[in-house]
């Protein structure tokens, strides 16, 4: 992830320059807009949209959720292998193609609509203190800058992974349910680690579901109506 230059977006959104009635200007520019929380970007270097809602301000910071957030990188290819090994090549192809198509959709979104997550002071202080949780969050923050957040790639790929596991729940029930429950922790982790806002999560769910089902109909061609019996019972 990277920040666009300050000239990427024109500052055409109106706002009241007189505090305290000054709402956050969109796109956000650290030079002219005082952030509601401390920004992670250097002043003047970014020019991004901030999708922070009133509900985002009430979400707690939970460093330990970095564990499922980081494990997502290992679980995604495992789910693909399970679909190929325990199910069929078509289901494997559906999941794999959905991941590729969804990433292309995300890339277009990131190109046209650049966002930034403003990490609050309390979260930054926890990370600065170190410890087990702080170290985990440093791993997340150090490898994933708070840009390119709408829609959330983690949420999109997690949704595709859970849909793939859902279709394996009768083949390997214990494994499928355990992995689905664990991967579901990625959803709250994205906002509780200050990586995304809730709008990113909602959009990621939509992209994940849409891409998976579109690829499923393209690859597997499921029947939408029951097959007609060519030799029905007499009198029926």
Model segments located where?
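Aromatic-anchored segments of alpha-helical transmembrane domains
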Residues: 1, 103-109, 181-192
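C-terminal membrane module of polytopic membrane proteins
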Residues: 183, 193, 203-236
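Membrane-interfacial alpha-helical segments at the cytosolic side of multi-pass membrane proteins
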Residues: 74-81, 155-179, 206-217
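Interfacial helix-loop-helix junctions of multi-pass membrane proteins
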Residues: 117-124, 145-150, 185-211
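Alpha-helical transmembrane spans of integral membrane proteins, capturing the lipid-embedded, hydrophobic core
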Residues: 66, 70, 74, 99, ...
């Amino acid at each position: 992830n990277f920040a666009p230059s300050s000239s990427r977006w024109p500052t055409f959104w109106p706002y009241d320059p007189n505090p305290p009635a000054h709402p956050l200007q969109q796109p956000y520019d650290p030079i002219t807009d005082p952030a509601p929380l401390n920004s992670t970007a250097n002043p003047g270097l970014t020019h991004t949209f901030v999708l922070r809602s009133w509900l985002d301000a009430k979400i707690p910071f939970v460093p330990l959720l970095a564990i499922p957030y980081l494990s997502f990188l290992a679980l995604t290819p495992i789910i693909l292998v399970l679909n190929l090994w325990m199910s069929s090549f078509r289901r494997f192809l559906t999941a794999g193609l959905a991941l590729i198509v969804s990433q292309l959709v995300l890339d277009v979104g990131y190109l046209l609509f650049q966002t930034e997550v403003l990490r609050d002071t309390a979260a930054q202080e926890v990370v600065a203190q170190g410890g087990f949780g702080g170290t985990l969050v440093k791993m997340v923050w150090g490898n994933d800058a708070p840009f390119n957040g709408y829609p959330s790639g983690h949420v999109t790929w997690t949704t595709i992974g859970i849909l793939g596991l859902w279709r394996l729940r009768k083949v390997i029930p214990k494994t499928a349910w355990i992995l689905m429950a664990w991967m579901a922790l990625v959803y709250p982790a994205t906002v509780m680690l200050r990586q995304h806002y809730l709008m990113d999560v909602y959009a990621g769910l939509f992209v994940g579901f849409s891409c998976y089902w579109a690829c499923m109909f393209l690859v597997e061609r499921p029947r939408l109506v029951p097959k007609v019996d060519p030799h029905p019972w007499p009198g029926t």
